[in-house]
């Protein structure tokens, strides 16, 4: 018995218990028993409430799952409103529950061209919504169930180049100055943005590449796309000329919107002269539509800031017919000229295109370059292809200097025939 009291004293309650009488101890014990019973009943009540709440949550989850069954009705968010019922209190007996709600409300327009006001937005957080968003709503209650990805024209999505081009700067001969200018205007602002910030200069918004056909404009754009990790959108000028009014301008808007979403990105517009010709008075609807498409392009070039990771590369071989508004500084800031290759460049181009061929050591590229006066880069490549076909025709295992000379004669004959044909 003494050991029990010693343990109690060790617990810090011994002195208090020793001073109490037996009746007081019995009374205290009864009080503790009643408190324990009350606590047990409280625990039981809370457990029942918890189970009831879990059942309710499960029931609501099942209802949400039923409501979220596809298909959704596609809608657009028109406006988001802050509603406070205290601002519009009026005397009256009839009080609508929805009118007493506080917080964000939404106005949506469905694909059936009906407009609805939603006092309860739905399962999407109001902070994540903004006017113009595409959402999926329940076809009966019109509650917003999910946000949908932004809708772009399927033709614009097809413009995105998924497979990277394989060209490299080393595959381009005689264009060292042009490569450096393009890298400074397009690649450096994307990969080394801090260099421009340290100097406090604004990088160019875009680049215009111009020159005769076959001088390597598109080839250099493909090499630039291969060397950067940016999204590459390739537009052709004739693609933007559409039959319906406003269709071409919408393509331009969607292309720039997609480029902004997937930034950093490069937009390459080939054959810019298809839509960028000088404006003139015309009564034909087709001419006016082309001019509207160009005006939308001008607007988009002015719309994004230079520090945004969206760059434009345009290419044309008729810079003389382009509208002056396209050529002014602030839109296509840097103009890069692609001249006809000189003798050294022609020799380098033929060397590049002969790298993978089985070529005899006696081939003199400098002499070949002297024989190909007024040839552009594409014709120099055609000489290499023709030389290979001539060697194949005679059953040779390697290309000789004579094969290249015959290839030059073949290309010159085609060139003269083409000139006579167009004359």
UniProtKB/Swiss-Prot annotation:
Xref: PROSITE patterns: AAA
Record keywords: ATP-binding, Cytoplasm, Nucleotide-binding, Nucleus, Proteasome
Record GO terms (molecular function): ATP binding; ATP hydrolysis activity; proteasome-activating activity
Major localization class: cytoplasm
Domain of life, source organism: Eukaryota
GO terms, biological process: proteasome-mediated ubiquitin-dependent protein catabolic process
Positions that bind ATP: 211-218
Single GO cellular component term: proteasome regulatory particle, base subcomplex
Localisation per UniProt entry: Cytoplasm; Nucleus
Entry's family note: Belongs to the AAA ATPase family.
Record note on quaternary structure: May form a heterodimer with a related family member.
PANTHER family: 26S PROTEASOME REGULATORY SUBUNIT (PTHR23073)
Described function: The 26S proteasome is involved in the ATP-dependent degradation of ubiquitinated proteins. The regulatory (or ATPase) complex confers ATP dependency and substrate specificity to the 26S complex.
Name listed for the protein in its UniProt record: 26S proteasome regulatory subunit 6A-A
Organism: Xenopus laevis
């Amino acid at each position: 018995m003494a050991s029990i009291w010693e343990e109690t004293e060790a617990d810090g309650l011994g002195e208090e218990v020793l001073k109490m009488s037996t009746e007081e101890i019995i009374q205290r014990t009864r009080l503790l028993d009643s408190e324990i019973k009350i606590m047990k009943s409280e625990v039981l009540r809370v457990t029942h409430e918890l189970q009831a709440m879990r059942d309710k949550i499960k029931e609501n989850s099942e209802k949400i799952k039923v409501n979220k069954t596809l298909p959704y009705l596609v809608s657009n968010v028109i406006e988001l409103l802050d509603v406070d019922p205290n601002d519009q209190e009026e005397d009256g007996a009839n009080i609508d529950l929805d009118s007493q709600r506080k917080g964000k409300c939404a106005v949506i327009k469905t694909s059936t061209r009906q407009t609805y006001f939603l006092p309860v937005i739905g399962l999407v957080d109001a902070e994540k919504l903004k006017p113009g968003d595409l959402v999926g709503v329940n076809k009966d209650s019109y509650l917003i169930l999910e946000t949908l990805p932004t809708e772009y024209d399927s033709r614009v999505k097809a413009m995105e180049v998924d497979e990277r081009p394989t060209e490299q700067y080393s595959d381009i001969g005689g264009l060292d100055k042009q490569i450096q200018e393009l890298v400074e205007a397009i690649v450096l602002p994307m990969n080394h943005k801090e260099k421009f910030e340290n100097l406090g200069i604004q990088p160019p918004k875009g680049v215009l590449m111009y020159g005769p056909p076959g001088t390597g404009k598109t080839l250099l754009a493909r090499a630039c796309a291969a060397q950067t990790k940016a999204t590459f959108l390739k537009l052709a000028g004739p693609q933007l000329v559409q039959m319906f009014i406003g269709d071409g301008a919408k393509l331009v808007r969607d292309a720039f919107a997609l480029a902004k979403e997937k930034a950093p990105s490069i937009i390459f517009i080939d054959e810019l002269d298809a839509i960028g010709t000088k404006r003139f008075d015309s009564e034909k609807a087709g001419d006016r539509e082309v001019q509207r498409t160009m005006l939308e392009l001008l607007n988009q070039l002015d719309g994004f800031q230079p520090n945004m990771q969206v760059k434009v590369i345009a290419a044309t071989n008729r810079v003389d017919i382009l509208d002056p508004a396209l050529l002014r500084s602030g839109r296509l800031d840097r103009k890069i000229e692609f001249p006809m290759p000189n003798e050294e460049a022609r020799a380098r181009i033929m060397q590049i295109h002969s790298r993978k061929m089985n070529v005899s050591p006696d081939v003199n590229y400098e002499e070949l370059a002297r024989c190909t006066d007024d040839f552009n880069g594409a014709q120099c490549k055609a000489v290499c292809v023709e030389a290979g076909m001539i060697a194949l025709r005679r059953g040779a295992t390697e290309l000789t200097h004579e094969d290249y000379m015959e290839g030059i004669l073949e290309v010159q004959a085609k060139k003269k025939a083409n000139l006579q044909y167009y004359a």
